[in-house]
Amino acid sequence: MQPLPKKLHDFRYFLIITWRHLNLPDPTPVQLEIAEYLQHGERRKIIQGFRGVGKSWITSTYVVWRLRMNPQLKFLVVSASKDRADNFSTFTMRLINEMPLLSPLIPQDHQRNSKISFDVAPASADHAPSVKSQGVLGQMAGSRADEVIADDCEVPNNSFTQPMRDKLAESVKEFDAILKPGGKITFLGTPQVENSLYLTLE
């Protein structure tokens, strides 16, 4: 697999190319700022923004960019609902299948290839898929990842009461057990309540 051109080692440029592939306007300054933070921010980061800013699409693009740079990485995508996590991984798979620059990542016949979990072609055999999606209240034991993407883990129907918020917080604590040494956690979301989970993480 040929390495990416040096210019595309800056995720912001890769995002611009992806947006053009999707026939979207070039990324806004806010979107480019999110892209820079994804690449250079702390190992544990929270990205909060209004609906429609494109947090999930930008981060999905970030996942394929990192896999193109290093196909041995493992990602776990966690959302409030399994459907939302699956939507994230489905969009990620579509980018891999549709962008010529990402064609070296298309899974081979003997590899996992579903919206629940998939491998990228150059990945070595491993118990953990390249990308796996699941609901935040699901069973995470046994999962391993270099980076956890927590995409809208907090929504009104799982954070309305204090016991619900406590249960959610306990699930989020499991992320540490999943991470490989030096791993990263990225939270994407919008606070839903005054005692938001995101406020306790800051």
For each feature predicted by the language model, list its residue ranges.
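Phosphate/NTP-binding elements of NTP-utilizing enzymes
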Residues: 2-202
